[in-house]
């Protein structure tokens, strides 16, 4: 199996959540993905390849959101689920890498369960609402409720990627519309609404571990200013891509290198 990639179910709260693991390292890395339309099931090999840089140093884990998302679920609730999954697998003192909504969840994980977090990476995320994220999420919810998946996928691409990237891949938009159609519309809407429940800013001082903030100045999903707010509040290390936006984690070739260097203290050779 490529990079020892595996898929399994993790039992918690009388339910099972999809779990991906890969890598063969002694240390644990918890990756918390952002809002997505499809979930992580079936993505173990592609994710292992995308984050192969971490596979020797770490055993990497990703936990999907719970299958039945209750109305009004918050990102803090999701952090509680991640903590429960880590407890179920006996994982403690892990490095944690949260992207977008995953970064919101990661903040609450570090605040509420400091025993679980050794180092923390907060990528293209926020700690409190702002007009950019509010308008973005509200539009995505409306488009989903209307069943306008074509415009939803196009709007996601325009807001996430650089203009050059969107122009290059515009011919593939019809294919993306099919591939990114939400499997469960109601679940996606509830998860999207949860993006507006992050209010960790006034509790950031409770985070006890080293933190690295990384983002894009041109972020049209959560706003480029959001990363700076977190880093200033924590007094932690930060790196911003001047010409990239929310999908800096995909577009920047050195993105994983920077995360790896912070977490391990090693340069990628």
Language-model segments: residues:
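Conserved HGGG/HGGXW glycine-rich cap/lid loop of the alpha/beta-hydrolase fold
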Residues: 9-69
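Conserved acidic catalytic loop of the alpha/beta-hydrolase fold
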Residues: 77-94
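Conserved alpha/beta-hydrolase "nucleophile elbow" surrounding the catalytic nucleophile
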Residues: 94, 98-103, 216
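Flexible "cap/lid" loop of the alpha/beta hydrolase fold
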Residues: 104-107, 111, 118-147
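Conserved alpha/beta-hydrolase catalytic His-Asp/Glu region
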Residues: 131-134, 150-203
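Short beta-strand/loop motif that positions the catalytic acidic residue
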Residues: 207, 213-215, 219
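Conserved alpha/beta-hydrolase "acid-adjacent" motif
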Residues: 220-226
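Catalytic histidine-centered segment of alpha/beta-hydrolase-like enzymes
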Residues: 244-257
């Amino acid at each position: 199996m490529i990079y020892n990639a595996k898929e399994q179910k993790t039992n918690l709260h009388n339910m099972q959540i999809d779990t991906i693991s890969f890598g063969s390292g002694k240390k644990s890395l918890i990756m918390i993905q952002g809002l997505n339309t499809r979930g992580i099931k079936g993505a173990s090999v592609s994710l292992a390849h995308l984050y192969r840089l971490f596979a020797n140093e770490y055993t990497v884990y990703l936990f999907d959101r719970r299958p039945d998302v209750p109305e009004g679920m918050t990102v803090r609730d999701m952090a509680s689920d991640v903590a429960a999954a880590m407890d179920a697998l006996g994982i403690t003192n892990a490095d944690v890498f949260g992207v977008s909504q995953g970064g919101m969840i990661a903040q609450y994980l570090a605040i509420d369960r400091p025993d679980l977090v050794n180092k923390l990476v907060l990528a293209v995320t926020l700690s409190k609402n702002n007009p950019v994220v509010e308008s973005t999420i509200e539009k995505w919810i409306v488009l989903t409720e209307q069943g306008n998946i074509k415009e939803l996928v196009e709007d996601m691409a325009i807001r996430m990627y650089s203009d050059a990237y969107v122009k290059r891949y515009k011919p593939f938009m019809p294919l993306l519309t099919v591939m990114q159609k939400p499997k469960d519309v109601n679940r996606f809407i509830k998860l999207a609404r949860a993006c507006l429940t992050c209010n960790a800013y006034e509790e950031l001082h409770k985070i006890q571990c080293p933190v690295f903030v990384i983002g894009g100045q041109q972020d049209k999903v959560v706003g480029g200013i959001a990363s700076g707010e977190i880093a200033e509040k924590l007094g932690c290390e930060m790196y911003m891509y001047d010409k990239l936006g929310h999908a800096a984690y995909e577009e920047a070739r050195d993105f994983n290198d920077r995360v790896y260097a912070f977490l391990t203290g090693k340069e990628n050779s």
